[in-house]
Amino acid sequence: MFSSYELREFFRRYKSEAVVKEHRFYSVLIPLVEREGKMHVLLEKRAAHISQPGEICFPGGRIDAGEPPQAAALRECNEEIGIPTGEIKVLAQGDTLYGQADFTIYSFIAEISEESYGRIKIERDEVEELYLIPLSYFVENEPEFYRERYETNIREFPYDKVGIPPDYEWRRGTMRIPIYEYDGIVIWGMTAQFLNRMSS
């Protein structure tokens, strides 16, 4: 058995962590580019052969082991559109999104100069096209919102072992999905959530 002293010493050195098994962490950059005196949001269209093909998103991706979220966002932006990390001015950490499918997405709002934007080199394996959309559009226009109700239905669970009935009422929730449309470009889901929060 542990003594009181041993327990105190153990917990003095104990480092708390979020209890998130099999959890994935991502980071995105929300790039702002000033052109003709107006600030624009830089968005990507995902390549047709990768996951979520054709969706509109920010530069970003999975965080490598031991990598700070901001460094991951800058690295992904460099890999996807060729802008050196030294030419990206991070203005602030944006919102953090916690998804129902075991993932967390960090966001960082940054400014990219018009000169750097002019030297962009698209990585075609990941990005099909780039868009510049006036920031004022998101400030002045609310997205459409669709609500999707979700619930847990666990059939293969040891109900007898934990002492609850098979018709146990698991937690339910409602997912609110925003959708923007600008000049034929449809932006929805997590990208739209970040934009709606930032512009509001």
Q: Positions of the model-derived regions?
A:
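Short aromatic-enriched loop/helix-cap "lid" or pocket-rim segments at secondary-structure transitions
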Residues: 143-145
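Flexible glycine-rich active-site/ligand-binding loops centered on an Asp-His dyad
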Residues: 127-132
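Phosphate/pyrophosphate-binding betaalpha-module
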Residues: 123-125
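N-terminal leader/linker segments that precede catalytic domains of diphosphate-processing enzymes
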Residues: 1-57, 62-79, 83-119, 136, ...
